[in-house]
Amino acid sequence: MSFVVTIPEALAAVATDLAGIGSTIGTANAAAAVPTTTVLAAAADEVSAAMAALFSGHAQAYQALSAQAALFHEQFVRALTAGAGSYAAAEAASAAPLEGVLDVINAPALALLGRPLIGNGANGAPGTGANGGDGGILIGNGGAGGSGAAGMPGGNGGAAGLFGNGGAGGAGGNVASGTAGFGGAGGAGGNGGLLFGAGGAGGVGGLAADAGDGGAGGDGGLFFGVGGAGGAGGTGTNVTGGAGGAGGNGGLLFGAGGVGGVGGDGVAFLGTAPGGPGGAGGAGGLFGVGGAGGAGGIGLVGNGGAGGSGGSALLWGDGGAGGAGGVGSTTGGAGGAGGNAGLLVGAGGAGGAGALGGGATGVGGAGGNGGTAGLLFGAGGAGGAGGFGFGGAGGAGGLGGKAGLIGDGGDGGAGGNGTGAKGGDGGAGGGAILVGNGGNGGNAGSGTPNGSAGTGGAGGLLGKNGMNGLP
């Protein structure tokens, strides 16, 4: 038995496009009709007259053929438009009885548990901070949380059923600029389906003098599912930027951890306002990678926020990268540490880079350390580079991560350059164990004096030692 799958909206869009093409061709034919069907003879002789008549005849034949083609095109567009309307009407007519069937199926579950068997949860109303409704017990996505009123937290996203995605958390409420108060925290994302489904993203923190933190991402499903991303921290206008929310954990068996939220920026009109720290990346499942850490927020008049640490894997998978530090007008934010690999196999996550420290005495942020590799196979994560000290010392480079039994150690991060102060020290390279080379040490940052170069990591039993960094 054959069947046809049709999308009425797509058919209607194609019909509209075809109508536009026909109109364009018709306009072009009309513009060309007069100069091509009445070709003037080049001279008064018989040959010129015959050639002009020949060309005019060809043009008239083309115009007649074009008229027939335009008629066919118009009929085809009408048929296509009518077909799209018929399919849409049939779809609407068949959906109504199905809704009644779903109501009958869901009624007992709603009466006993307050939750349908099949269907998506309701979204929280904006400005109320209400939580999103949970999805159907069997199949259904969680509803999104409602945004918060001024200074109030956003609602949490609803959880999914056995199959479905968690709802996104609502945004925290803002507080008007120049007004004292705390921004509302973003709502947490709902968890994914118990068996399959992704976690919902966390809500964004509210803008205020003391900004709200971003909401945590929801966890993925038990078997398969990606963790939700953490919400970004709100912008702080006088006190501090909000912290980024942590990424949700991946599914227990298969799934990547969610990315950590970005820290909120600190924008001070009076006093100082450091940037908020980035959120940590979520842990991966037994077979899955850890989520990357969120970047730290910028401190326009204050320190930059630290980058979030990368999430670690459980059994088989790479660790997440650490988030970069936020630029600060005084001290740059430190980079987040890279996540560790799974217990058996995987590479360690790279450490995040330290950020620039501005101002007359600005100090660069330190680079994050690289993550450790799995016990059997895997390379250590590279250390993050230290930040540049615009008016002060450079940041130290992060340490390279250790390798597994088979794998190379991670390279150490380079030290940041300092201006009128000491350069940052290079990070040491990570060591290898059995088969693999040690990581190279990070180069020293220039300054007054220069920093110390990082030492190379020890090589494995079957491997070479890493090279020391350049002084």
UniProtKB/Swiss-Prot annotation:
Region (Essential for translocation to the cell surface): 1-30
Pfam family, one: PE
Span of domain PE: 1-93
Region ranges (Interacts with TLR2): 140-230
Key words of the record: Cell outer membrane, Cell wall, Membrane, Secreted, Virulence
Location within or outside the cell: Secreted, Cell wall; Cell surface; Cell outer membrane
One cellular component (GO) term of this entry: extracellular region
Similarity annotation: Belongs to the mycobacterial PE family. PGRS subfamily.
Assembly, per entry: Interacts with human TLR2.
Entry remark concerning the domains of this protein: Contains an N-terminal PE domain, followed by a conserved linker region and a C-terminal PGRS domain.
Protein task: Induces TNF-alpha release through human Toll-like receptor 2 (TLR2) signaling pathway, leading to macrophage apoptosis.
Name assigned to this protein: PE-PGRS family protein PE_PGRS33
Organism: Mycobacterium tuberculosis (strain CDC 1551 / Oshkosh)
Gene it is expressed from: PE_PGRS33
